[in-house]
């Protein structure tokens, strides 16, 4: 049996990007976006869960929401880098989707996740 879950959260945060080209994104600005975390396992924990939704929310939303991402994260806070950070930050997370704004979406997928992707959400 494979168990999957997803947790979607709204995130409001500011950042500026360090880029190799001229861009208005190099100036401090904010986003009201959305993050979805996907987790899976073939063995539920002792409480009968993949992972507690509150744990995911506390770790991601509680850390990033209304924060300055440049101060909170040790990397250039692009949507792609944030998605990768989430995958590495949450146990059993195999995919993270970061919607920085309408139409702008980045995703990171753990290509070494031990469950066959065809069984995942």
What are these regions (language model features)?
Residues 1-121:
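Charge-rich, low-complexity N-terminal segments
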């Amino acid at each position: 049996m494979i168990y999957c879950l997803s947790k979607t959260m709204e995130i409001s945060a500011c950042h500026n990007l360090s880029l190799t080209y001229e861009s208005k994104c190099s100036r401090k600005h904010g986003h009201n976006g959305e993050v979805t975390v996907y987790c899976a396992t073939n063995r539920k924990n002792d409480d009968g869960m993949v992972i507690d939704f509150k744990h995911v929310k506390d770790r991601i939303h509680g850390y990033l929401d209304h924060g300055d991402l440049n101060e909170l994260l040790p990397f250039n806070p692009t949507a792609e880098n944030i998605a990768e950070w989430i995958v590495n930050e949450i146990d059993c997370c195999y995919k993270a989707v970061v919607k920085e704004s309408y139409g702008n979406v980045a995703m990171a997928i753990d290509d070494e996740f031990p469950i066959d992707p065809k069984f995942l959400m």
